[in-house]
């Protein structure tokens, strides 16, 4: 969904102003230095949450071509979910063992309306550094298409 400038009411003594919503979002941007596979041109995203769709969240590009993903914390999609990050992934995220990371499994709707989450290649975000990365653990323990309850 494209962001547009919005008029801001100004005091009577000042001329009308406008603000760029994207500029405001950019202050909270998560940088993906390598992009997301298939969307490498998109490097900055915002994570949007709303009670209306909780526990789902939306990861939306604020640069590059339009791109947005709906996802869920994989630990909510599958009880006992654990994913071990490689040293390379930890370094790319600027994280260590004490860093609290955010996890995001992309959800897709299949032709019959079944919702599936990609638990094999989650997006991991370091909120302290505002850096994200889609990871692909070597163990391959989890499916790319984990069926969620409900339909689109």
Please annotate each region the language model reported.
Residues 81-90:
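Short beta-strand-centered segments at strand-helix junctions
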Residues 2-80, 98-152:
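Long, compositionally biased stretches
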Residues 90-96:
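Structured, beta-strand-rich domain cores
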């Amino acid at each position: 969904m494209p962001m547009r400038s919005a008029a801001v009411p100004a005091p009577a003594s000042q001329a009308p102003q406008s603000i760029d919503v994207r500029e405001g979002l950019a202050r909270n941007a998560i940088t993906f230095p390598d992009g997301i596979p298939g969307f490498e041109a998109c490097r900055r995203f915002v994570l949007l949450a709303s009670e209306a769709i909780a526990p789902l969240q939306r990861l939306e590009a604020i640069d590059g071509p339009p791109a947005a993903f709906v996802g869920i914390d994989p630990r909510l999609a599958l009880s006992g979910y654990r994913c071990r990050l490689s040293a390379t992934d930890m370094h790319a995220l600027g994280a260590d063992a004490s860093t609290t990371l955010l996890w995001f499994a992309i959800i897709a709707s299949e032709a019959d309306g079944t919702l599936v989450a990609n638990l094999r290649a989650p997006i991991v975000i370091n909120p302290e550094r505002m850096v994200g990365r889609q990871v692909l653990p070597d163990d391959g323990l989890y499916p790319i298409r984990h069926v969620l309850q409900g339909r689109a």
